[in-house]
């Protein structure tokens, strides 16, 4: 049979067949054997040996591309190969016959040039065997295809030489042409052999997992997969790669079709053998239903996902497959997150996992035991070189340290993950690992830099994220949400509430809970207290049902701030105490410190600054050690207010000392606010400093602070100076 210049017999009965490209590779091997050791240097021979494996295993490439690869390793040998192929293509059919006859001599003699069991020897034997099985008409078609292959290569070489002599603009066009040609090389090549197909599928799967930008485009990859499936429709792995490729473009119909075909082919080919006395097709059926449920869940088809899960549970119960049932229970929890009983499902999942010895979750333990469990799992991951699980574990620890309020440890874990070389990536020839773990770590890194006022560094991290995870990739939503949150915080710090309000829509589309919370923050900043209170109460009820403790505490703090800004600090105290109890119960140290900060502010408003100072001494250390720059400034500003309020009853000398200490703390707070460009708070600090300098009789310093206040007050007009109504 002849297809696209490729002569092959029974596709399933032979693993290799002769193509014009493989004839060119055979010429290269023959020339390497004929060339003496002195003619080729040791470095060039080493490069050629490294080049051979991808040439033997990879798909067919154009002749010009092959010339270029050989020339990079050994220019002298590239010239010999080019001359030899030219003589064969411009000669007669008997030259091709003679060439294959000469190949058999490579195995003869006491010291043959090639060993029969080596990689090169097996390739030569397969090619000789495949050529010997061809009929005369097939040999003639192969020779015609070789001539066409040579002519196309010569034409491409001439075009490249002409374009190299053009100017810079022409060079840009050449680069664009090269990209299109590379895609055509893959799509226009003939059917792949079994080894080539396996190599191609494993390579593209590794690229989709680790570095999607270097993989073929969705259209080119699908075209190549369709070409592969046309000659071998029962190739299950090709159907699965087609499923992954369709997920890239969010094609629900094609991805479902490919997924079902994958499990069908597993049953037909017998790839799923007997397991624990069960037939392989039963295992394929239940895991097919489970994967189908996961697919529908990804696209938001929750009703179809529940139906598929019910089918998977029914088959798993009939087969007594507890592992599959555990997976189904976990997916039931994912599907039920919008319901009030989701936490009950999670508890059942954990109990079932513990009962059957399947540690899928670790809950209900203290923070130190949680970290110990992660450490023990890391030991197993490193022992067995499970690089993907290592990455996930480090990303989890990064998120956990941030949740507990230890930004320094979170930063260390994120940098550790980014500096690691994945074992799987190196074995697959991929230089970077573009998994979800790396996206999470980079997003944490960007947010940590933004919290410290390093917006340029955060911007560089986000720029790298956008290049590493294009907008159409599956993990792009992570950096999109991170970017929107950083822009929102900067707009709020700068007093641009209208800009922050416009960003709420994008945040809501990516994370509904976060978007509603940010909307309430904007309404509160715009003094729309009634609307903000209604929104916060609805969000609080919803988060309490979902057991989202971190967001519950954040909402409680916003509700308390709303109360004291409405001149009701006594109502805010029970709310703050509830938030403090939750943060202490779940050991959220940073949120606990922030809650204590709010309690101290409430006590200041109630007229007990001495008690507020005592509370501040408990909370300020974690904030100064691991807190965001804005929170550090708020803490120092509050300390200054408490010092001034406490000094009202002091004698003149002691009062002057207290005011001097308050001024120093105000200067430190102003420096913190300046790092995040929070001009509204800088204005408040400048006003407060001017009043203190006036009380101390320092006219020059007072005038300077008054001038700064006036400039900022003109840029940020307001109805009054909010020194007491917000923290």
UniProtKB/Swiss-Prot annotation:
Keyword Cell division listed: yes
Species this protein is from: Rattus norvegicus (Rat)
Protein family (similarity comment): Belongs to the APC5 family.
UniProt gene name: Anapc5
TPR repeat intervals: 194-234, 235-285, 286-322, 323-359, 360-390, 391-438, 439-472, 473-512, 513-552, 553-592, 593-632, 633-668, 669-708
InterPro entries to which the protein is assigned, alphabetical: Apc5, Apc5_dom, Apc5_N, TPR-like_helical_dom_sf
Coiled-coil intervals, chain numbering: none
Protein name: Anaphase-promoting complex subunit 5
Cellular component terms per the entry's GO annotation: anaphase-promoting complex; cytoplasm; nucleus; spindle
Major site of localization recorded for this protein: nucleus
Subcellular location: Nucleus; Cytoplasm, Cytoskeleton, Spindle
Transmembrane segments annotated in the record for this chain: none
Pfam families documented for this protein: ANAPC5 (PF12862), Apc5_N (PF21371)
Function per UniProt: Component of the anaphase promoting complex/cyclosome (APC/C), a cell cycle-regulated E3 ubiquitin ligase that controls progression through mitosis and the G1 phase of the cell cycle. The APC/C complex acts by mediating ubiquitination and subsequent degradation of target proteins: it mainly mediates the formation of 'Lys-11'-linked polyubiquitin chains and, to a lower extent, the formation of 'Lys-48'- and 'Lys-63'-linked polyubiquitin chains. The APC/C complex catalyzes assembly of branched 'Lys-11'-/'Lys-48'-linked branched ubiquitin chains on target proteins.
rRNA-binding as UniProt keyword: no
Modified-residue entries (Phosphothreonine), positions: 217
Keywords: Cell cycle, Cell division, Cytoplasm, Cytoskeleton, Mitosis, Nucleus, Phosphoprotein, Repeat, TPR repeat, Ubl conjugation pathway
CDD domains documented for this protein: Apc5_N (cd16270)
GO biological process: anaphase-promoting complex-dependent catabolic process; cell division; positive regulation of mitotic metaphase/anaphase transition; protein branched polyubiquitination; protein K11-linked ubiquitination; protein K48-linked ubiquitination
């Amino acid at each position: 049979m002849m297809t696209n210049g490729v002569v092959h017999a029974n596709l399933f009965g032979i693993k290799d067949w002769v193509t014009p490209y493989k004839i060119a590779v055979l010429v290269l091997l023959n020339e390497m054997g004929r060339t003496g050791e002195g003619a080729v240097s040791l470095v060039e021979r080493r490069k050629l040996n490294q080049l051979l494996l991808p040439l033997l295993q990879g798909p067919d490439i154009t002749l010009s591309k092959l010339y270029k690869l050989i020339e990079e390793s050994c220019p002298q040998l590239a010239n010999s190969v080019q001359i030899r192929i030219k003589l064969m293509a411009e000669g007669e059919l008997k030259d091709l016959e003679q060439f294959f006859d000469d190949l058999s001599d490579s195995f003869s003699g006491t010291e043959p040039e090639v060993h029969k069991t080596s990689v090169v020897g097996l390739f030569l034997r397969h090619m000789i065997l495949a050529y010997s099985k061809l009929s005369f008409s097939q040999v003639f078609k192969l020779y015609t295809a070789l001539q066409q292959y040579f002519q196309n290569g010569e034409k491409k070489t001439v075009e490249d030489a002409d374009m190299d002599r053009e100017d810079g603009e022409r060079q840009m066009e050449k680069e664009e042409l090269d990209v299109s040609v590379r895609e055509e090389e893959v799509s226009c090549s003939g059917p792949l052999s079994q080894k080539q197909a396996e190599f191609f599928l494993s390579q593209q799967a590794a690229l989709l997992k680790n570095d999607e930008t270097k993989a073929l485009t969705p259209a080119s990859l699908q075209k190549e997969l369709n070409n592969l499936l046309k000659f071998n429709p029962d190739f299950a792995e090709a159907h699965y790669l087609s499923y992954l490729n369709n997920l890239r473009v969010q094609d629900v119909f094609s991805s479902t079709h490919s997924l079902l075909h994958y499990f069908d082919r597993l049953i037909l080919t017998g790839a799923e053998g007997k397991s624990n006395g069960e037939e392989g097709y039963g295992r394929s059926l239940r895991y097919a239903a489970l994967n189908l449920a996961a697919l529908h869940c990804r696209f938001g088809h929750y009703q179809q996902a529940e139906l598929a899960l019910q089918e998977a549970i029914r088959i798993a119960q009939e087969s007594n497959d507890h592992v599959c049932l555990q997976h189904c229970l976990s997916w039931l929890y994912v599907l039920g997150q919008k319901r009030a009983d989701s936490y009950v499902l999670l508890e059942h999942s954990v109990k079932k996992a513990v009962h059957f010895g399947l540690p899928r979750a670790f809950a209900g333990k203290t923070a130190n035991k949680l970290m110990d469990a992660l450490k023990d799992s890391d030991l197993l991951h490193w022992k067995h070189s499970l690089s993907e699980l290592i990455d996930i574990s480090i990303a989890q620890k990064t998120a956990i340290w941030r949740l507990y309020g230890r930004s320094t440890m979170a930063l260390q874990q994120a940098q550790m993950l980014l500096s690691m070389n994945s074992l799987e990536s190196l074995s697959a020839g991929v230089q970077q690992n573009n998994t979800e773990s790396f996206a999470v770590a980079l997003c944490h890194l960007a947010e940590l830099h933004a919290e410290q006022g390093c917006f340029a560094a955060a911007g560089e991290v986000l720029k790298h994220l956008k290049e590493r995870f294009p907008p159409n990739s599956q993990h792009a939503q992570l950096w999109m949400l991170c970017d929107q949150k950083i822009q929102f915080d900067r707009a709020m710090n700068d007093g641009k509430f209208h800009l922050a309000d416009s960003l709420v829509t994008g945040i809501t589309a990516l994370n509904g809970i976060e978007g509603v919370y940010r909307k309430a923050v904007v309404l509160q900043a715009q003094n729309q207290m009634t609307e903000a209170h209604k929104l916060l109460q609805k969000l609080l009820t919803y988060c309490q049902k979902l057991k989202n403790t971190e967001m519950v505490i954040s909402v409680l703090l916003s509700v308390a701030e709303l109360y004291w800004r409405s001149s009701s600090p006594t109502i805010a105290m029970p709310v703050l105490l509830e938030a403090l109890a939750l943060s202490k119960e779940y050991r959220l140290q940073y949120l606990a410190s922030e809650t204590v900060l709010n309690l101290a502010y409430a006590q200041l408003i109630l007229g007990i600054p001495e008690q507020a100072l005592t509370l501040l001494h408990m909370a300020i250390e974690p904030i100064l050690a691991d807190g965001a720059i804005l929170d550090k400034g708020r803490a120092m500003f509050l300390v200054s207010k408490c010092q001034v309020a406490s000094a009202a009853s002091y004698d003149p000398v002691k009062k002057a000392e207290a005011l001097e200490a308050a001024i120093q703390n105000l200067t430190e707070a102003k420096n913190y606010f300046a790092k995040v460009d929070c001009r509204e708070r800088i204005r408040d600090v400048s006003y407060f400093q001017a009043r203190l300098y006036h009380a101390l009789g320092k006219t020059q310093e007072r005038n300077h602070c008054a001038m700064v206040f006036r400039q900022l007050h003109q840029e940020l007009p307001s109805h009054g100076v909010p020194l007491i109504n917000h923290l």
